[in-house]
Amino acid sequence: MAMLPPPGPQSFVRFTKQSLALIEQRIAEGKTKEPKEEKKDDHDEGPKPSSDLEAGKQLPFIYGDIPAGMVSEPLEDLDPYYADKKTFIVLNKGKAIFRFNATPALYILSPFSPLRRISIKILVHSLFSMLIMCTILTNCIFMTMNNPAEWTKNVEYTFTGIYTFESLVKIFARGFCVGEFTFLRDPWNWLDFIVIVFAYLTEFVNLGNVSALRTFRVLRALKTISVIPGLKTIVGALIQSVKKLSDVIILTVFCLSVFALIGLQLFMGHLKHKCLRKIENETLESIMSSIESEEDYKKYFYYLEGSKDALLCGFSTDSGQCPEGYYCVKAGRNPDYGYTSFDTFSWAFLALFRLMTQDYWENLYQQTLRAAGKTYMIFFVVVIFLGSFYLINLILAVVAMAYEEQNQANIEEAKQKELEFQQMLDRLKKEQEEAEAIAAAAAEYTSIGRSRIMGLSESSSETSKLSSKSAKERRNRRKKKNQKKLSSGEEKGDDEKLSKSESEESISRKQFHLGVEGHRLAREKRLSAPNQSPLSIRGSLFSARRSSRTSLFSFKGRGKDIGSETEFADDEHSIFGDNESRRGSLFVPQRPQERRSSNLSQASRSPPMLQMNGKMHSAVDCNGVVSLVDGPSALMLPNGQLLPEVIIDKATSDDSGTTQIRKKRRSSSYLLSEDMLNDPHLRQRAMSRASILTNTVEELEESRQKCPSWWYRFAHTFLIWNCSPFWIKFKKFIYIIVMDPFVDLAITICIVLNTLFMAMEHHPMTEEFKNVLVVGNLVFTGIFAAEMVLKLIAMDPYEYFQVGWNVFDSLIVTLSLVELFLADVEGLSVLRSFRLLRVFKLAKSWPTLNMLIKIIGNSVGPLGNLTLVLAIIVFIFAVVGMQLFGKSYKECVCKINDDCSLPRWHMNDFFHSFLIVFRVLCGEWIETMWDCMEVAGQAMCLIVYMMVMVIGNLVVLNLFLALLLSSFSSDNLSAIEEDTDANNLQIAVTRIKKGINYVKQTLRELILKAFSKKPKISKEIRQAEDLNSKKENYISNRTLAEMSKDYNFHKEKDKISGFGSSMDKYLMEESDHQSFIHNPSLTVTVPIAPGESDLENMNTEELSSDSESEYSKERLNRSSSSECSTVDNALPGEGEEAEAEPVNSDEPEACFTDGCVRRFPCCQVSIESGKGKIWWNIRKTCYRIVEHSWFESFIVLMILLSSGALAFEDIYIEKKKTIKIILEYADKIFTYIFILEMLLKWVAYGYKTYFTNAWCWLDFLIVDVSLVTLVANTLGYSDLGPIKSLRTLRALRPLRALSRFEGMRVVVNALIGAIPSIMNVLLVCLIFWLIFSIMGVNLFAGKFYQCVNTTDDSRFPTKQVSNRSECFALMNGSQNVRWKNLKVNFDNVGLRYLSLLQVATFKGWMDIMYAAVDSVNVDQQPSYEHNLYMYIYFVIFIIFGSFFTLNLFIGVIIDNFNQQKKKLGGQDIFMTEEQKKYYNAMKKLGSKKPQKPIPRPGNKFQGCIFDLVTNQAFDITIMILICLNMVTMMVEKEGQSDYMTDVLYWINVVFIILFTGECVLKLISLRHYYFTIGWNIFDFVVVILSIVGMFLAELIETYFVSPTLFRVIRLARIGRILRLIKGAKGIRTLLFALMMSLPALFNIGLLLFLVMFIYAIFGMSNFAYVKKEAGINDMFNFETFGNSMICLFQITTSAGWDGLLAPILNSAPPDCDPKKVHPGSSTEGDCGSPSVGIFYFVSYIIISFLVVVNMYIAVILENFSVATEESTEPLSEDDFEMFYEVWEKFDPDATQFIEYSKLSDFAAALDPPLLIAKPNKVQLIAMDLPMVSGDRIHCLDILFAFTKRVLGESGEMDSLRSQMEERFMSANPSKVSYEPITTTLKRKQEDVSATVIQRAYRRYRLRQNVKNISSIYIKEGDKDDDLPNKGDIVFDNVNSSSPEKTDATASTISPPSYDSVTKPDKEKYEKDKTEKEDKGKDGKETKK
C-alpha cells in the first residue's frame, strides 16, 4: 500500500518544467537500479495506485480546500505511485480529479503550451460535461422521430459539430493514443470516435443503405453512461456477469443442441400435417397442384375460426383427429408463417430456445401434441424441467453471484480505504502540539452557554435509576453539550447522517406519554447514546446502518413513563425500565456482510442493567432479540460471572462498510502545524480542515449542516410554538390524546375502512351507493385532516415534520383536500388515485409491509442506476428497431395483415417500437419476431431480437432480481415473525384483551361463589384459566413478555414435564407454537449447573457474534439439562410432545388430555385390575398392530389404490358399466378399511396423541368425507347438490400419501414453515395491486363493452355503431348483434385482481391491454388505439406489480429456506436422510481408495490392443467421431433429396461400424474388466441398439414402434461427450450443481405431481363438460385424467391459463347452453362456474407457479453457490482423483503403500498443485512421513503431507485431516492395520548417524594399524582424531533435535494408528479442536 503524503498546504504544487525534470530524473534513477532488482521474485508486486486518488474520483476531503488559483491548473500528482511516471493532475471546482499524460500531446503540445492549457480548462469545467449531456439528450429526442423533416438535417450537422469539438478538446488536452491517459486509452472514447467517423462517412461517401448506418448514431445514447459516474460501475458489473456467463452459455447451447436433435428426429415434418377436405374424384396431387396462393388454402383445409393456421392433425391414435369429411395429409407450409417447425436443425433449435424461455410455448406444445401424439408430453416435461427451470435459473444464479462478488469487492475497497486513512492519521498525530492551541480555543467557544441547562439535564438523568454511576456522569457531560444544540435547533444536521427514518431516529421520535419536554429529553438521550453505556462499542450516533433493523419494530414505547402500558398489570409484570430508555446504546458492532451471524443480546449481559429485586424480566435489545433476564440470584454463577446464553440463531442486518470509515475519519483528532497560523490564507484552510476532523461532535454537526444557521433560528422562532403556559398545557393534553395507542388503533381502522370504501367502487353503481361512497370519502378525509392538525398542535411543526410518516400523512391529506376542491374539473379524476397512497399508512403498524417497502426502497438505490441502464438499452433497441425495420413494416404490411393496416405491434414509430422492446423484456418475443421476419427478412430480425432477449431479459432483468434478492438479507422476514417490540396497535389490542379477561374473571368468580360446591376443583380450574389468560397477554405476537418468578412456586408438586418449575406459571404448553420453544430465534438465558456447561469458564463478552459459535451454543443447548433443555426444534405442525419420563416405545400413551381427566374423573381407568386391565391389553395389541411396518405398507397401498381409482371417473365412466360397478364396491371397501385404521389408531394412540398430530387430523377429515358420502349413498341421497360437492373432496385423498412418503413430507414441512411469509407477501402484493386496481376502476370501469357481430366475433367499426343505444337499435333488427363485455375486466374488485394477475403473469394480458387502449368512454363503442397512452399504465404495473412483487416470492422463499436450514443445523431441508447420504457421497467423490488398475493381458496381440485402447489419443479420436456423428445428424432435414438421404444412411453405417469396432477392440483387450466401467456398458447398449435399429428398421416399423425412437437412441452417444467435461472446470461445476440438486428436485417434482394429481381429479369432476372454446378443445380438456394432467402441466409455468379459464367463465346464455345434452351421461349443460374456476386456477398458479417452482429455483441457487465454493477451493476433488490415478501406477496391487525409494518419482509424477518437482529429496525428508516396516509409506500420509504443503499450516488442516481419515475409513473398511515404526526424517537422521559411526569406526581401525609408524603419521592421526569429534557433534545435534522435532509435530502430523482411532480419541480430538477455535475467537475479539 502506498503511504500517502500528509495532506497539507504543501500537497498542492503547481506542475512546472522543474517538476517534469524531477520526474525524468527519477525515471533515470529507476532504470539504473532495475538490473539489480530483476532478480527479485515476481511475486513481490510493486506499489499500487491509491484507490482514492484515481482519475474521476472526488478529492478526499482530508485534503481540505483547494487553494485559490490552483483550480483547473496542472498540479503535481498527489499519488506517490505516479512519482516516477510522467503524469500530472488537474482539479476542478467540484474537486474531481483529472489525470493527464505529461508527454507532448500529438508530439506538438507540451503540458505548458497555451492551447493545451485552455483545452484542459474547458475539459475539466463542469459546464462542458453538462453541455455534452444536454446535446446527447436533445440528439436522442431527434432520433425518435420516424420521418424527420428537412430542417432536422441542419440540426444533425450541429450535433456532429458539437461532438467533433468535444473530441478535439479531449485530444488536445490528453493526446491521441501514445502513452497513458490519452484519448484512445479510454474505451468510452472509442465509442465517440466511431460515432464521429460514421457521421462523416455517411455525409461524404455514398454507402447505399443509409438507414442501417444511421442506426450507428444510436450508440451516442451510450455516451450518457460515460458521463454519469454511477452508471459506469453498473455497466462494469454487467460486463463482469456476461464474462461469467460464458460457461452457462456453452452448457445451454450444448443442452439445447441435444434437445433440438431429439426434436428434429421425433417431430421432423409433423407440423405440416393438415386436415384436407374429401373431394370426389380428386387425388391429393391434383389438389396440391391446383393450390397457388394462401387464399386457396382456405377452400381445401380446415381452419378453426379466428386462427391464421390450418388445424393440425396426426396419424397416431392419441394425436389430434380431423373432423368428419376431412382426412389427414402432409401438405403446405408449417404454422406461423412457416417459422414453427422441427424440420431442420436450426428451426428446431429456435423452437427449443423458445421452449427454454417459455415464450408462448403452450402453442408449440399443443401443436406438437396434436400432430405427434400425447405421449410426447414426456419430451416437453424433460425440456421444461431441465432446460427451462434449470438453465434459465443458472443464468440467474451466475448473475446474482457476479453481483454479490462486485458487492464484496466494494466492501473490500472500503476496508482498504479505512486502513489508508488510519495510516494517514497516524502521521498527522506527530503534529499534535501545534494544533492544541486552536483546539483549546474551539473548546472555549463551544463551552459557552452550557451551564444554563444544568438543572434540566440533572433531572433527566434521574430517570434512569438503574444505570451505573459512570454511565450517568458521562451522560450528563454529553447532555450539556447536546442541550445547547437542541436549543439552537441543530439536530437536523445530525438526522441527515442517520440514514433517514432508519436507525434509532425512528425509535426516539415515536415515544408516547411524554410531555413535549420529555419528548425532547428523550431525543437528547438518543443523541447521547455513544458514550452512555459501557456496551456501546462504537458510537451509535454514526451507526447509520443500511438496513438497520430497529426501524422495523421499534416504533413505540421508548419512554420511561409507561404507566399506560401497565394499567391492568400488577407490579410483578412491570417492564424492565431503563432498558427501554437506553435502547440506543445496545448496538452490536457488526462486520460488513456478516449477515448470518447470530447476535447476542447484549442487554441480557450487562450487570449494571439488572434490577436487584430477584424478578425475571425480558430485555429486548435493538436487534429485536428477546432475552429472559433474571434477577441476580439466578443469573450469576457462584463466581459472579454472567451465565452463558442459549442462543438460537438470529440473523443480523448488514452494516455498510462505508459508515465505519466515516466514523474513523471523524473520530480521530486532527492537527495543524505552527507556520499555518501566521499565513492568514493558510490559517483559513487550517480552520476548515480542523472543522472537518475534530472529534467534537458539535463542530462536526456544523460542518455537516444542510441548512444555513438563519434557517434554524427561523425554525426555532416560528415552528416551535411555546407561547403561553395555558397553550403548553393544552398542547400536553392534546399530545396525550393523539399519541395514545387507542387513537392509533382508531386511525388504522379508518385507513382499512377507507381502503375498503375505495375498493367497493364498481361499474354499474346505484346513486345511493355512489352517495355513500362520496360521503364516506368526505368523512375519512375529515378524520385524517383532523389527525394531522392535532398532531401538528401536539408536536409543533418542527417536531412533526422530522418524522417520515408524518410528512407522508401531510402530503396525502393535502392532496385529498386539493382533490376535493377540484373534484368537478374534467380529467383530474386521476387525482383520486393519490388517496390510495393512504393504504401505505398501514405499513406503520404492519411490519411486513414496512419491511417489503423498505426492501424495495433499498434496492431502488442500486436499481436506480440499473433502471437507467435498462432504459438506455430499451431506448437504443427501440431506435434501432425503428430505423432498421420501420420502413419494411410500412411497405410489406400486407404479408402479416389481411386488411393491409399496421398491426398493433409494429416498429413504424418510436412508441410502438418501445412497446415491442418492452414486450421482449417481459419475455414475449417470438410472436413479434415472426411478424418482423415476415416483413423484414429473417437474419436481421433474429439478430436484433436475440440481442434484446439475451442482454435485456436474461442479463439485466436477472441483475434486477439479484439486486432484489441481495436486499433480502437474511434477517428481514424472520425478524418480523418475532417482532418483539409491541407497536401501538399491539399495545392497544393487548389492553383490550386484558380488559376482557378481567371482566371474564370477575364474572366467573361471582358465578363460582354462587354455585360452587367443590372449591378444590374450581381453584384448579381457575389456575388453569389464569395460566391461559396470562399466556394470551404476555406472549402475544410471538413475544416472550415478562416471565415473573415466584419463589414459592418451587414447592408446588405438579410440574410441567421436562421444564423446571420456576417458569411453570407463565410458560405455554410445549405444543403451543407461539412459545419460544418453537420460535428458535429468541435468546433465552438459562441457568446451567456448573459441571454441565462447556462454555462455563469463558468470559461472557467473548460469546462473539461470529457464526462459528453457533455450534458451541447448539451443543450447550443439547447438553445442559437445564430448564430449557427439552427445547424442541421441530417444525410447527408436527406437534411432537416433549415428554419428560422416557416412554417405553411399545406402550400406548394416555387416551385423554390431562384437562379432560381433571374435569371428568370418570375418564381415569385403573389399568391394574379387571376391565381396565383387559382394556389395557386390547390397547397394547392395537398399538403393536399399528406400529408394525406391514400395517403401514398396507395402508400406503390402499391409499395409492383409492387415489388411482379416482382417475377412472372420467366422462366415459357411464359407458363402461363394469368398471363403474367395480369402482363403487372398491370405494366402499376403501372407506371401511380407512375407518378401521382410524379406530385402531384411536385405541392405540389415544385421542390426545391422535388429535395433536396434524397429519392424523388430515386423515380424520378425509375419512369423514368418505363416510358422509357412503351414508348418503346408502340412504339414496347421492344426487343432492351438497353431497355431490362433498364427493369432489375425495380428490384430497392423495394428500394422505404425503405423511407416508418421507421425501414429500420433508418438502411439505419446509413449505409449511414458509407459509407465514408467503402469506405476508401475498397480502402485500394484494395491497400493492389494490392501488393499480383502484386506478383501473377510475380509468377503465365499464369501458370494455363493445358491440360485436356474433357470427365471427368481430367488432363493428365506430362509423357504424358509436355507442350502446345504437347497438341496441341494431340488436332489435338482427339476431347476430350483441353488446358484450370482456370476460376479464375492471368492473369490480375481484375481476380487477384477476385482470392484474393475467397481466402480471403475461398470460391473456394482450386482450386486456387492447381493450384498455381502445376504450373510449362508458357506453361508447371502442375505437382502435383511441387511448394509446394507456399502455403506460400497464408498463408501470408490470414493473412494480410483476417484476417486483412476483420476484418477492422468490426472495421470500429462498430467504425462508435459509432460515429453516439454520434451524436444522445447515442441512438441506428438501432431502430425506437417505437422500442426504447420496448427497454427501456426491460431495465426497474424493473418498476413492486406490484401485487396482486393469491388468495388461499377457498375450502379445491383446497387449498391443490394450496399449492402443488405453492411450489418451484413442479416447480423443472417439470423441471427435462422436462430434462428427452429431454434426451429420444435424445436417438431416425434412424434405431432403433421395441422394442426400442415401449419403447420410451410408455415413451412419460407417459410424456404426467404427463404434462397433471400438467396442470389439475394448472387449478383446479389457476382457471381463470391460463391464466394470459404467461408460463402457452405456456404449455397448448404444451400439447394440444402433445395429438392431439399422438392420431391423423395416420389420420393427411394421410391427412395433417407429424407428425414430432408435434414431433418438443414437443420440444417447452424445452423452459420452460429457466425459470430456473433466477438462472444462466451469461447466463441470454447473453439472455438479445439477447432480447435487437432483434429490431435492425429485422431491419437489413429486410434490408437484401430487398437487397436479389432486387438481386433475378436481378438474375432472367440475369442468369435464364445459364448452369447447379458447384453450379448451378436443385434445386439451378436463374430460379424462390424462387430458387434465396435460393441461395442468402446461399451467405449471402459468402458460395459457387464461385460455383454460375463459370457457369456465361462461355462466349463462348466450355464452353457453345450460340445457345441452351430453350423450351417455346424466350431466346436462356446458356452462362453467366462474367462482370455482377462478379459485381453481388462481390457487393452482399460486401453489405451482409461484411457490413450488420457486422452491426449485431456491434449490438451484443454493446448490450452485455450494458447487462454486467447492470449485474455488485450492484443492478440489479432481486433484485427489488425479493423486490416486498416479498412485495406481506406483502401487499396481492396491496395497495402499509404496516404497520409500519410489517416493521421489511419485511426487514428480503428480500434476500441480500437488506436484513436487525434482530435485525433491530434501522437501520429502522434511515432511517427516511415517513409515512402516519394509520402508513403506501409506498413501493417506503422503496425500496429507502434500495437501498441507499446498494449503499451508492452519487450524483448518486438522479438520481436513480428520475428514480425510473419516473418508478413508468409510471407503476402506478393510484398512490394513499398521504401526508406523519410523518417519522419513528419522530415517534420514538414522542414515546420517550410521554413516558417522561407520566413519568413526573405520578411522579407529586405521589408527590401530598405523600406530607404530613414524611421528608424522601420529600428527596426521591427531588431525583425523578431530574429524570424528566433529561428526560426534553433528550427531549429538541431530539426536538432541530429534525428540523435540517429533514431539512438536506429533500433534499435527503423525496420524493416530488407524485401527486405534476409537471413539475416545475422536472426542478428545473434537474437544481440542473446539478449544483451539475458542482461542482463535478470543484472539479475534481482542483484535476488535
Swiss-Prot record:
> Residue limits of the IQ domain?
1886-1915
Residues on the membrane's Cytoplasmic side span: 1-125, 173-185, 228-241, 401-742, 794-802, 846-862, 965-1184, 1248-1249, 1302-1314, 1455-1511, 1565-1573, 1625-1637, 1757-1984
What ranges does the Extracellular topological domain annotation cover?
Answer: 146-150, 205-210, 268-344, 362-374, 760-768, 820-828, 886-912, 926-937, 1210-1221, 1276-1284, 1340-1391, 1403-1428, 1532-1542, 1596-1604, 1661-1683, 1697-1730
- A Pfam family it matches: IQ_SCN5A_C
Q: Where are the III repeats?
A: 1177-1485
- Give the start-end ranges of region Disordered: 26-55, 459-517, 563-610, 1087-1146, 1924-1984
User: What is the designated name of this protein?
Assistant: Sodium channel protein type 9 subunit alpha
| Record gene name | SCN9A
